């Protein structure tokens, strides 16, 4: 055949192929139109975190036996445990316990391996401050229970996000 005719046929095939690709992309865009939005208006709406969410660590001073298992299993040796050996009863007495959340990677190893369950993960994730030294929590700050977002009337909580079907 003539070269001009074959070029015209190739041009027609390429045009049809391009139109098909544009149509496929448009169909994907239309399939997302009936889904609910994934984003939330953060300060005014908050998601209720799952049970397994790893937020700020809660510490119960009375349960701790100063065994330092949390320090040994921490990948960055983060918890600082100060204790004193009581010679009359031959047991350790905990003096101070602190965690710096500016360095913590929230892996949860300390909570998982604690033999007395004095450590637990809370759902509190708002730990931002203007000074990084304020993120060093001692046993008093670690012992405070987190404020539940369910009890705050100014915040609308979003319970269940629908599953995205693909």
Swiss-Prot record:
Localization per Swiss-Prot or TrEMBL: Plastid, Chloroplast thylakoid membrane
Positions that bind [4Fe-4S] cluster 2: 74, 104, 107, 110
MF GO annotations: 4 iron, 4 sulfur cluster binding; iron ion binding; NADH dehydrogenase (ubiquinone) activity; quinone binding
Protein name in UniProt: NAD(P)H-quinone oxidoreductase subunit I, chloroplastic
GO cellular component: chloroplast thylakoid membrane
Gene name of the encoded protein: ndhI
SUPFAM superfamilies in alphabetical order: 4Fe-4S ferredoxins
Catalytic activity: a plastoquinone + NADH + (n+1) H(+)(in) = a plastoquinol + NAD(+) + n H(+)(out); a plastoquinone + NADPH + (n+1) H(+)(in) = a plastoquinol + NADP(+) + n H(+)(out)
Source organism, top-level taxon: Eukaryota
First-listed, main subcellular location of the protein, grouped into a coarse class: plastid
Record: residues binding [4Fe-4S] cluster 1: 64, 67, 70, 114
């Amino acid at each position: 055949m003539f070269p001009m005719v074959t070029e015209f046929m190739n041009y027609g095939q390429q045009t049809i192929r391009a139109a098909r690709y544009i149509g496929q992309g448009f169909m994907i865009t239309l399939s997302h139109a009936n889904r609910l939005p994934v984003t939330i208006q953060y300060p005014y709406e908050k998601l209720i975190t799952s049970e397994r969410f790893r937020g700020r660590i809660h510490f119960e001073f009375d349960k701790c036996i100063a065994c330092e298992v949390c320090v040994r299993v921490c990948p960055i040796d983060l918890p600082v445990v100060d204790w004193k050996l009581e010679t009359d009863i031959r047991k350790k007495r905990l003096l101070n316990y602190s965690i710096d959340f500016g360095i913590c990677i929230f892996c949860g190893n300390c909570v998982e391996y604690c033999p007395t369950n004095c450590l637990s993960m809370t759902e509190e994730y708002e730990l931002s401050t203007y000074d990084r030294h304020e993120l060093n929590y001692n046993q008093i700050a670690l012992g405070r229970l987190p404020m539940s977002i369910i009890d705050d009337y100014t915040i609308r909580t979003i319970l269940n996000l629908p599953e995205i079907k693909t």
